[in-house]
């Protein structure tokens, strides 16, 4: 009986034989907000983690460990890979929705939300530094850009929350009147 491969290269959404995306060393605001850069960094991270995971599992199996125990020993890579796959799928869903919108303010706001999602995902993922996808300076650039995006999204915050259709009873009082929620009488 032949062993089934741990994964199929077809699991990758991109052609596994295609060249790896190359990330710029200097990250500008426009680069960080570029959907192609965001797609490239998410695909590079997923592809590299998949290769690392399969290599580690294969090495452990080569030393006589069972496939199941090899998976257990590789849990950190498996966790990072699962997160990378999910975040890439979410980014692609946002990009697909954004592509269907006509040019205008809604598309512009969705672009800001997409950039916020992508950059927060990158900012909060320690595997980006652990495996060298981004430098410490790059992570600092990402953090600064997230702050800028927060400022740009602030005027749209109420409309964004309303667009999700969340019932008022599920929202904190601060969502309705920030000034009233933070007065001394209510604190």
Swiss-Prot record:
Descriptive protein name: Putative acyl-coenzyme A oxidase At3g06690
Keywords: Fatty acid metabolism, Lipid metabolism, Oxidoreductase
Xref: Gene3D superfamilies: Butyryl-CoA Dehydrogenase, subunit A, domain 3 (1.20.140.10)
Superkingdom assignment: Eukaryota
Keyword Transport in annotation: no
UniProt enzyme class: oxidoreductase
Record lineage: Eukaryota, Viridiplantae, Streptophyta, Embryophyta, Tracheophyta
GO cellular component, one term: peroxisome
Keyword tRNA-binding in record: no
Chemical reaction(s) catalysed: a 2,3-saturated acyl-CoA + O2 = a (2E)-enoyl-CoA + H2O2
GO biological process: one example: fatty acid beta-oxidation
């Amino acid at each position: 009986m032949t062993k089934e491969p741990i994964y199929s290269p077809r699991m990758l959404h991109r052609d596994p034989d295609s060249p790896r995306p190359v990330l710029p060393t200097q990250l500008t605001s426009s680069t960080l907000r570029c959907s192609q850069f965001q797609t490239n960094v998410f695909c590079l991270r997923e592809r590299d983690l998949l290769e690392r995971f399969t290599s580690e599992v294969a090495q452990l199996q080569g030393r006589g460990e069972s496939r199941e125990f090899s998976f257990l020993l590789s849990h950190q890579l498996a966790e990072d890979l699962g997160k990378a796959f999910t975040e890439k799928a979410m980014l692609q869903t946002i990009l697909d929705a954004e592509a269907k919108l006509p040019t205008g303010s809604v598309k512009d706001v969705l672009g800001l939300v997409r950039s916020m999602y992508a950059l927060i995902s990158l900012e909060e993922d320690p595997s980006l530094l652990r495996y060298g996808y981004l430098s410490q300076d790059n992570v600092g650039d990402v953090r600064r850009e997230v702050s800028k995006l927060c400022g740009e999204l602030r005027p749209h915050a109420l409309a964004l929350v309303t667009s999700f259709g969340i019932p008022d009873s599920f929202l904190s009082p601060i969502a309705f009147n920030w000034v009233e929620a933070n007065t001394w009488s209510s604190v």
